[in-house]
Structure formats: structure tokens, C-alpha cells
Swiss-Prot record:
InterPro entries: Ribosomal_Su5_D2-typ_SF, Ribsml_uS5_D2-typ_fold_subgr, RNase_P. The gene is rnpA. It catalyses: Endonucleolytic cleavage of RNA, removing 5'-extranucleotides from tRNA precursor. This is Ribonuclease P protein component. GO terms for biological process: tRNA 5'-leader removal. Its EC number is 3.1.26.5. GO terms for molecular function: 3'-tRNA processing endoribonuclease activity; ribonuclease P activity; tRNA binding. SUPFAM superfamilies: Ribosomal protein S5 domain 2-like. HAMAP family: RNase_P.
Amino acid sequence: MTISEKKHTVGRLKSRPQFLAVREGEKRRGGFFLLEVLDRKEPDSQARVGFTVTKKHGNAVERNRMRRRLKEAVRLHAGFAMQPGHDYVVVARRDVLDASFQELAAELKSRVETRPKHRRSGDGRPRNV
């Protein structure tokens, strides 16, 4: 790699306040996970990612396996698509264990690349008049 080439790396979310801040952002639902995204309004800083697997999804061995699969999918396929200055939290669902790695990586990449939908001034639901 030459000096002019920029290595695109993804940082990590480590503390509870960082994870809680991302919960206030956009949520992108998928079959294998929920992706929470927060724009930090700092375009010069690198993207950061964190992983959450709740205890209802099995014992520690299974939860760690889910986390490892998601980390590897981000490293190989989705990390380059993450926008600088954004924080991402991947909340795993049980189906992460049963999905093929190609399906998992494709869905993760798709969710990361999805752009937010702009809503009209209303909440989008019809009113009863």
C-alpha cells in the first residue's frame, strides 16, 4: 500500500454511552440483525461499529459465535461501505447462526448501503378526520 492510498478501517464502539447514543439514530431492520446507525456529523472521522447479542439468544458460546460471524462479515464485506463519521451497532438475531455466511454478508452490506428515507413533515400515517 502506498502512502497516497488510504487504508479504510472501521473503528470500534466500546463504552455503554456510545452504544446508547446510537440507539437514538436510524434503525434498519433485517432478517438476521437490526442495524442502528447514527450520523455523528464528523465527516473526517472514521466509521465505528459495535456488536450486541442479548442473553435471550443462547449461552455464551452461541452468543460469541454470532458476534464473531458478524465481525467477520463487517471486516470482509461491509466495512468499506460504512460512511465516515457514522456509528453502527449490529444487534444480532438468532438466525445469524443458521444463515450461510454469504447470505449474512450480503444482507449486512445491503443494510449498510441503504440510505435513509426522507419523511414528510407528518408521521406518515393517515389521519382520522
